[in-house]
Each structure stands twice: as structure tokens, then as C-alpha cells.
Curated annotation (Swiss-Prot):
Residue ranges of the region described as Disordered: 143-247, 356-428
Function description: Endoplasmic reticulum (ER)-shaping membrane protein that plays a role in determining ER morphology. Involved in the stabilization of nascent three-way ER tubular junctions within the ER network. May also play a role as a curvature-stabilizing protein within the three-way ER tubular junction network. May be involved in limb development. Is involved in central nervous system development.
UniProt gene name: LNPK
Keyword Cytoplasm: no
Residues where Phosphoserine is found: S114, S153, S177, S182, S194, S217, S227, S321, S353, S384, S414
Molecular function via GO: identical protein binding; zinc ion binding
Lipidation sites (N-myristoyl glycine): G2
Effect of substituting S231A: Inhibits phosphorylation and degradation in mitosis and prevents homodimerization and three-way ER tubular junction formations
Domain notes: The transmembrane domain 1 and 2 function as a signal-anchor and stop-transfer sequence, respectively, generating a double-spanning integral membrane protein with a N- and C-terminal cytoplasmic orientation. Transmembrane domain 1 and 2 are probably sufficient to mediate membrane translocation and topology formation in a N-myristoylation-independent manner. Transmembrane domain 2 is sufficient to block the protein secretion pathway. The two coiled-coil domains are necessary for its endoplasmic reticulum (ER) three-way tubular junction localization.
Keyword set, alphabetical order: Coiled coil, Developmental protein, Disease variant, Endoplasmic reticulum, Epilepsy, Intellectual disability, Lipoprotein, Membrane, Metal-binding, Myristate, Phosphoprotein, Transmembrane, Transmembrane helix, Zinc, Zinc-finger
Entry protein name: Endoplasmic reticulum junction formation protein lunapark
Effect of S194D: Inhibits phosphorylation and degradation in mitosis but does not prevent homodimerization and three-way ER tubular junction formations
Length: 428
């Protein structure tokens, strides 16, 4: 009957074996921690109680039981010299006992871990994909660690601030493999691809998790629909961007820095932060006077943030020639001149203006390298412009000279004849 029942008794499955091994491993790990705590506790109590007892006995013997003879005192102090050695030997024995227990525990723990590793290798070779994936996720310590480390990063990427989304997305894009697997190749048994939710980690040796990146991109992209510029899909492939527009002041500043900032009137409290309009990242700080007129490129998303205001520009001053002004003032102060002198002065003025224009054109040719045709055109235009007011001035001077001559020359009737006046006097 026993043989029949033994035949009907089913063999434990790999999951049950792994569960029993896992329980034993947990028990051994707990025992190891407990053994270490007991070792520290026993050694600490031994040192504490022995030191208190040693001091107390020394005090009592010194006050009441100390003999007068030297030999008796020496015999009395010998136990006090031997007591620390005894306590030290007891401490070493306790440490040796607990260390032996810890070694036996570690050996058993290593054996169980090696058994579990062998069973997991057999599972990866023999079991189907789905069962192998479940067993590895449940009993493989590497997959457990990956699963424990993954949800905080995924949750942080989902609930992150707008300034951190691009950095996490670029990190996820860099982790993607450049060559996807071909559809003709069947999935090997030890390289499973996780069909489950995106948060579950894949088996060890499998391809990188592609399901996390679309979820992140789908959660991140709608936030930037209303932003001034749409995000670029291959942003993680950009080279490192330009330096920040303004240096970031250190957070920890000494007393001397604070005093200098107070005297100069500079510091973080007197500056404005440069925040990117697209990814809301911090790009340094700018002075109050420059904040409205500064344009910068983000160091994280490379978005060009335009200036809030355009800097006002002063009106352009008119061109002024000191020599021409002296000539005009001199001609106005002298007054009207004869027509010949006016013409000569005008000719001199035209020659001087032409020479001055030629010199200016030569200097401009050396500085700006203007072609020869443009220089001649400019000289002709300036000469024509200078001749027009000079012709007007000539006509005005001629009219004024004619009027003066008419006023100074008397009429023929009004001129007295000296001969007639003399004859009239003699006749009288």
C-alpha cells in the first residue's frame, strides 16, 4: 500500500521547490542578522559589567582592605592586573563562538543560493516563455532589484516638473537600441520580451524595455502643445549646447561674499532667474537692468528665448563739418562784397569743398574699400549739392550790390554845375 501511495504522490513542482528554498534563505538571513545582534549585545554587556565591577572593587579595596605591608599590597593588586586579561579572553571566546555560527549559516545560505540558481537555469531552458517569465520575476534576485529600481524612475518621469521631462526623455532615448529585432527570428527561450504592463521589468538578458518610452513620450508631449515651440523628437541626440547665458551663483556663500554683495548691491536677491519658455529650466541669473533686454538659448532644450523688450536706441546725430561752418560764419560777418570778390570767394569755397570731399572720399576708400565709380558719384553729388546754395548766395549778393550802387549814384538833374554857379555870382 505504501508503494502505491508513493507512486500516486506527485512530485513537487519547480515553483514549490523555489518557494521552499526562498523560505529557507530568508530564515538563514534572519538568523545571520540575529546572530550579529547577539554578538554585539553579549560583547557590549561583558565589557560594561566587567568595567563597572573592576572600578567598584578597586575603590573598595583601596579604601578598606588595603594592607600596610608591601608584599601584601603586591599580592592584593595581582588579581587587578589579571582581571582585564581574563575579560579580554572571555570576549575573544564569545566572538569566536558567534563567528563559527555565522560561518555555518553563510555556508548553508550559499548552498541554497546555488541550488536556486541551478533551478532557475533549468527553468530558462525547459519551461515555456510565460512560466519562465513569471518564475524569474518572482524568484530571481536580479529581476527583483530591477523591478524595485524601475517604478521610482517611471513615476518621477510621469509626475516630474516640466523642467525635468526633457532630461529624463533624453536619457530614455539614449537607452534605446538602434537596431530592432527582425520579425523572422523567433524569440529564444532565455530572451523573453515582456508583454505585460510597462512598469514590469524584463527578464535578465532580454532587450531593453521599449514600452516605457512611448508612455513617457505620450505623457510628456501633450504638455508642450501650447508652448511657443514644439519639442523635437530627437532631442537626446543633440550635442552639448552652448554655455549658460549667465553664471549660476553658488548657493553656499561665505561671510566675506555676503559683505561684498551687500556693499556692491549684487547677489541672488538682486537678480532675476532666466527660465526657459519651453522646458522651464533654470539658465542662470541676470541683473535687473539687463533682464528685460536679454535673449538667451536654453542649455537643456536649445530653445532660443527672445528678449522681452527691445533696447531703446538714441537718435542718430546729423553730420557736422566745422570748416564749412567757419566759412559760412565768416561770409555772413563780412557782409555784401563786390560781385568779383563774391565770385572769387565762391570759387575758392567750391575748390576747398571739392578738396575736402576728395580727401573724405580717399579716407573712406582706405577704410571701407568703396569702388572708384561710387567715389566719383559721391564727389559729383556733393559738389552739386554745395553749388546750389552757393548760386543762390551769388544771386542775392549781386542784387544787393546793384541796389547799393543805385542808391549811391545821384540823378543827373540834381548834380550842380560849377561853371553856371560862378557866372551867376559874377553877374550879380
Amino acid at each position: 500500500m505504501g508503494g502505491l501511495f508513493s507512486r500516486w504522490r506527485t512530485k513537487p513542482s519547480t515553483v514549490e521547490v523555489l518557494e521552499s528554498i526562498d523560505k529557507e534563505i530568508q530564515a538563514l538571513e534572519e538568523f545571520r542578522e540575529k546572530n550579529q545582534r547577539l554578538q554585539k549585545l553579549w560583547v557590549g554587556r561583558l565589557i560594561l559589567y566587567s568595567s563597572v565591577l573592576y572600578l567598584f572593587t578597586c575603590l573598595i579595596v583601596y579604601l578598606w582592605y588595603l594592607p600596610d605591608e608591601f608584599t601584601a599590597r603586591l599580592a592584593m593588586t595581582l588579581p587587578f592586573f589579571a582581571f582585564p586579561l581574563i575579560i579580554w579572553s572571555i570576549r575573544t571566546v564569545i566572538i569566536f563562538f558567534f563567528s563559527k555560527r555565522t560561518e555555518r549559516n553563510n555556508e548553508a545560505l550559499d548552498d541554497l543560493k546555488s541550488q536556486r540558481k541551478k533551478i532557475l537555469e533549468e527553468v530558462m531552458e525547459k519551461e515555456t516563455y510565460k512560466t519562465a517569465k513569471l518564475i524569474l520575476e518572482r524568484f530571481d534576485p536580479d529581476s527583483k532589484k530591477a523591478k524595485e529600481c524601475e517604478p521610482p524612475s517611471a513615476g518621477a518621469a510621469v509626475t516630474a516638473r516640466p523642467g525635468q521631462e526633457i532630461r529624463q526623455r533624453t536619457a530614455a532615448q539614449r537607452n534605446l537600441s538602434p537596431t530592432p529585432a527582425s520579425p523572422n527570428q523567433g524569440p529564444p527561450p532565455q530572451v523573453p520580451v515582456s508583454p505585460g504592463p510597462p512598469k514590469d521589468s524584463s527578464a535578465p538578458g532580454g532587450p531593453p524595455e521599449r514600452t516605457v518610452t512611448p508612455a513617457l513620450s505620450s505623457n510628456v508631449l501633450p504638455r508642450h502643445l501650447g508652448s511657443p515651440a514644439t519639442s523635437v523628437p530627437g532631442m537626446g541626440l543633440h550635442p552639448p549646447g552652448p554655455p549658460l547665458a549667465r553664471p549660476i551663483l553658488p548657493r553656499e556663500r561665505g561671510a566675506l561674499d555676503r559683505i561684498v554683495e551687500y556693499l556692491v548691491g549684487d547677489g541672488p536677491q538682486n537678480r532675476y532667474a532666466l527660465i526657459c519658455q519651453q522646458c522651464f529650466s533654470h539658465n542662470g541669473m541676470a541683473l535687473k537692468e539687463e533682464f528685460e533686454y536679454i535673449a538667451f538659448r536654453c542649455a537643456y532644450c536649445f530653445f532660443l528665448n527672445p528678449a522681452r523688450k527691445t533696447r531703446p536706441q538714441a537718435p542718430r546725430l546729423p553730420e557736422f563739418s566745422f570748416e564749412k561752418r567757419q566759412v559760412v560764419e565768416g561770409s555772413s560777418s563780412v557782409g555784401p562784397l563786390p560781385s568779383g570778390s563774391v565770385l572769387s570767394s565762391d570759387n575758392q569755397f567750391n575748390e576747398e569743398s571739392l578738396e575736402h570731399d576728395v580727401l573724405d572720399d580717399n579716407t573712406e576708400q582706405t577704410d571701407d574699400k568703396i569702388p572708384a565709380t561710387e567715389q566719383t558719384n559721391q564727389v559729383i553729388e556733393k559738389a552739386s549739392d554745395s553749388e546750389e546754395p552757393e548760386e543762390k548766395q551769388e544771386t542775392e549778393n549781386e542784387e544787393a550790390s546793384v541796389i547799393e550802387t543805385n542808391s549811391t549814384v545821384p540823378g543827373a538833374d540834381s548834380i550842380p554845375d560849377p561853371e553856371l554857379s560862378g557866372e551867376s555870382l559874377t553877374a550879380e
